[in-house]
Amino acid sequence: MPNTSFLQRFLQVQLTLNKGEFADGKNSKIIDNLAISAKIEKLGPPDFGKASVEIYGMPLADMEQLTTLNFRPLFVSRNYINIFAGDDVNGMNQVFAGTIVSASADFNSQPETKFKIEAQIGFWGSVTAQAPTSIKGTQSVADFVAQQAKKAGMNFINEGVTASLRYCVFNGSPIQQARTAAFQVGAELITDDDDMILLPANKPRSGDVPLLSKDTGLLGYPSITQNGIEFKAIFNPAFKFAGLVELKSIVPKTSGQWRIVKLVHNLTSNMPNNGAWESQITGFYPHLSGAIGRFI
């Protein structure tokens, strides 16, 4: 992806109500003409990906429909948010999908009110209570995880795990049971947006490997930290959590392919005083960052 620092960028937020409807009589609304800022974090086990969104100038009736009472943390509506980012040249790409866990209006930011949303990937699949699951005999771990993904309301993708489970019992929510099963066979389970992805140990997600250099969106210079190689870049939808990125830099020992173990997008649109459109990436050795828990 070429350096696109001077393109006009767009954020699009789709809000879907589990119950009720907006003023237009529909249960889903797309917002793309208001000032929006979004911080999206893609994280690995035991955490979940999350997003913090602020929308300015939202109609009062819409805010009323979406507002939750934050002091009742277990009373969460099954409202859903999808976030898309892009530009006129490269089109729009989904960068987040998850359950709204809190939403409220801030009227102290006058002259523009802002509506603040916190969302989490796989929320209901992580808190839904269910009975223990007993496997009598042998079952492929892919089939077992697929069943748990369905219970969690997520899509299932198997990227090459062929191991089996034998005579075992799993407890907890659908996602907890799926994670435990993957760990038991030495595989890795990723929850990303609508997908539950099963990976062989220490293998990156499939797909193209974006090349990142000063000519293709690298911002500043990479840093070597205890957590891995950390660097910033102009947002690129090809960056995928648990996927690879190829880095080219003059900083010694930072060039090469790294597995993305933490991915944070800071994105804004229609905000004259804030043009943030960047990603913060932490990369680690591809062969050491998988099921052994090298997510940070």
Positions of PLM-derived features:
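Short beta-strand-centered interaction patches in the first periplasmic/extracellular domains
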Residues: 2, 107-124, 151-222
